[in-house]
UniProtKB/Swiss-Prot annotation:
NDH-1 shuttles electrons from NAD(P)H, via FMN and iron-sulfur (Fe-S) centers, to quinones in the respiratory chain. The immediate electron acceptor for the enzyme in this species is believed to be plastoquinone. Couples the redox reaction to proton translocation (for every two electrons transferred, four hydrogen ions are translocated across the cytoplasmic membrane), and thus conserves the redox energy in a proton gradient. It is found in: Cellular thylakoid membrane. Keywords: Membrane, NAD, NADP, Plastoquinone, Quinone, Thylakoid, Translocase, Transmembrane, Transmembrane helix. Disulfide bonds: none annotated. Belongs to the complex I subunit 4 family. The keyword ATP-binding does not apply. One of its GO terms (molecular function) is ubiquinone binding. InterPro entries: NADH_Q_OxRdtase_chain4, NADH_Q_OxRdtase_chainM/4, NADH_UbQ_OxRdtase, ND/Mrp_TM. Its EC number is 7.1.1.-. It holds the Pfam family Proton_antipo_M. This is NAD(P)H-quinone oxidoreductase chain 4. It comes from Prochlorococcus marinus (strain NATL2A). The lineage of its organism: Bacteria, Bacillati, Cyanobacteriota, Cyanophyceae, Synechococcales.
Length: 538
């Protein structure tokens, strides 16, 4: 071997994976271009692929899945007078999502091949967003997290405002108002936690914050603000309305970034900050997360069923599936929380595949209205096969990743003895409604697109060519891990199970403290303690 293993293990892989695509983006304006954008497309693809290979190398050369603690850690003094340091690292919560980010971005660059309007700006934004999103999962400082969180807002805003559909300005403005406005809660909570001790220099590092003995009232206040901020990004109903509008106007590669990566930032942040750094507040808020998860599943599934616009139908389907992430995070079992983590990875792959196919179908039919489609299966048989495979993955067909992740959440929550049995039965029964609705609206969607009576006007005007090799390759790259995880989930769960176990143990200790307090209150007053805490009493 040319490079010794110790050097590879201590190589700054994460910093390289963050700055390489950002520096690559800065070079994009200087790429020679003959007017067709061919050169910049290949350049962006090479940069994105190298970034993906860097994250893969980080996993295999510097990351041990059996270890619970932080790995690949780098810390450099940045602005010491303000208590700011450049610190990055990875554990089981972040490493799978770092890999997912670089993988989806590489495919999004390939999906953006047909972009001809301002291609340099488009690929500049994709590469810059790649580095920013990896930073969200890799940084170990709350102020750095806030900066990385904000960095990805502007590329998405420009994607929507410049390359979006007819209502692009409305969708872009709504996106920036929701996400930038809610980000203020992250900044306020981060400053409050960093300055908690008072007197000395603030410390915003995750490790330092996890060791602080925050008061319960302080935790509840910070938890509430962070829940709003991360709930917008997840999204949680009723903070979700920006997402259908954004998806309704976005192009295929932007769809892939939104569904594949952006929504996962909210789920990751709930685990990293709310569950890990604020355990006492999480023990009290967890039942609310469960209820919100059920609302997400049922409301979004019913709304998706009623949608006649293809993009909005898939957008609401995404919101429904993210409800399982909320239930898993709200559970106090390693199996349930592990299922939430797997659901984020699974949905990232499945959501990216479905939205890419939506874009590919629109490029041919020039319509998103299901009422205007029908009977195109005879002309696009390979496209129909790709749609069918991805729809089956979304409806959680056994043997695919969606099935095992949702099953883990269900079983983990139902067997979680922290909650009372009646509460578990009611939640499981209601969530099952969403599981039943999903195949109904997805299979009916396939029927309306590909079967039934042909729309003569559509058939005569549209270029109904079948899937091209580039499109087949993108879907194949997404289906391989979807099926691989579905058949052998340990390949993914082993990556983060040690970190999940440590997180759940910390939260269970908080549950015991809450139970002790509740027992004291009940013995003294013999009164109900309220609906949020009641499910904790078993």
């Amino acid at each position: 071997m040319l490079i010794p293993e110790p050097i590879l293990a201590h190589f700054p892989w994460l910093s390289l994976s963050i700055f390489f695509p950002i520096v690559g983006a800065l070079i994009v304006p200087f790429i020679p271009d003959k007017g067709e954008g061919k050169e910049v497309r290949w350049y962006a693809l090479i940069i994105a692929l190298i970034t993906f290979l860097i994250t893969v190398a980080a996993y295999f050369k510097g990351f041990d899945p059996s270890q619970e603690g932080l790995q690949l850690y780098e810390k450099v003094s940045w602005l010491p007078d303000l208590g700011l340091t450049w610190s990055v690292g990875a554990d089981g919560l972040s490493m799978p999502l770092i890999l997912l980010t670089s993988f989806i971005t590489s495919l999004a660059v390939l999906a953006a091949w047909p972009v001809s309007y301002k291609p340099k700006l488009f690929f500049f934004l994709i590469l810059a967003m790649d580095g920013g999103q990896i930073a969200v999962f890799a940084v170990q400082d709350m102020l750095l997290f806030f900066l990385a969180w904000e960095l990805e807002l502007f590329p998405v805003y420009l994607f929507l405002a410049i390359w979006g559909g007819k209502k692009r300005q409305y969708a872009a403005t709504k996106f920036i108002i929701y996400t930038a406005g809610s980000s203020l809660f992250i900044l306020l909570a981060g400053l409050a936690m960093g300055f908690f001790q008072g007197g000395g220099m603030p410390d915003f590092g995750y490790t330092h914050l996890a060791q602080q003995n925050f008061g319960k009232g302080f935790q509840l206040l910070c938890y509430s603000g962070l829940l709003i901020a991360f709930g917008v990004k997840l999204p949680i109903v009723p903070l979700h309305t920006w997402l259908p509008d954004a998806h309704g106007e976005a192009t295929a590669p932007v769809h892939m970034l939104l569904a594949g990566i952006l929504l996962k930032m909210g789920g990751y942040a709930l685990l990293r900050f709310n569950a890990q750094l604020l355990p006492d507040a999480h023990a009290q808020f967890a039942p609310l997360l469960i209820v919100l998860g059920v609302v997400n599943i049922i409301y979004a599934a019913l709304t998706s069923f009623a949608q006649r616009n293809l993009k909005r139908k898939i957008a609401y389907s995404s919101i429904s599936h993210m409800g399982f992430v909320l239930i898993g995070i709200g559970s106090f079992s390693s199996l349930g929380t592990s299922g939430a983590m797997l659901q984020m990875v699974s949905h990232g792959l499945i959501g990216a595949s479905l939205f890419f196919l939506v874009g590919a179908t629109y490029d041919r039919t020039h319509t998103l209205q299901l009422d205007e489609m029908g009977g195109i299966g005879q002309n696009m048989r390979i496209m129909f096969a790709l749609w069918t495979a991805c729809a089956f993955a979304s409806l959680a067909l056994p043997g695919m990743s969606g099935f095992i992740s949702e099953l883990m959440v269900f079983v983990g929550f139902v067997t979680d003895e922290v909650y009372t049995l009646p509460f578990r039965i009611v939640v499981a029964s209601l969530a099952a409604i969403g599981v039943i609705l999903t195949p109904i609206y997805l299979l009916s969607m396939l029927r309306e697109i590909f079967f039934g009576k042909e729309n003569a006007k559509l058939i005569s005007k549209a270029k109904l060519v079948d899937a091209e090799p580039r499109e087949i390759y993108i879907i194949a790259c997404l289906l391989v891990p979807i099926i691989g995880i579905g058949l052998y989930p340990k390949i993914m769960t082993d990556t983060y199970i040690s970190s999940i176990d440590g997180l759940v143990k910390r939260d269970l200790l908080a549950v015991e403290r809450i139970r002790s307090d509740q027992t004291t209150i009940i013995s003294n007053s013999n009164l109900s303690i309220g609906t949020i805490e009641a499910p904790l009493l078993d």
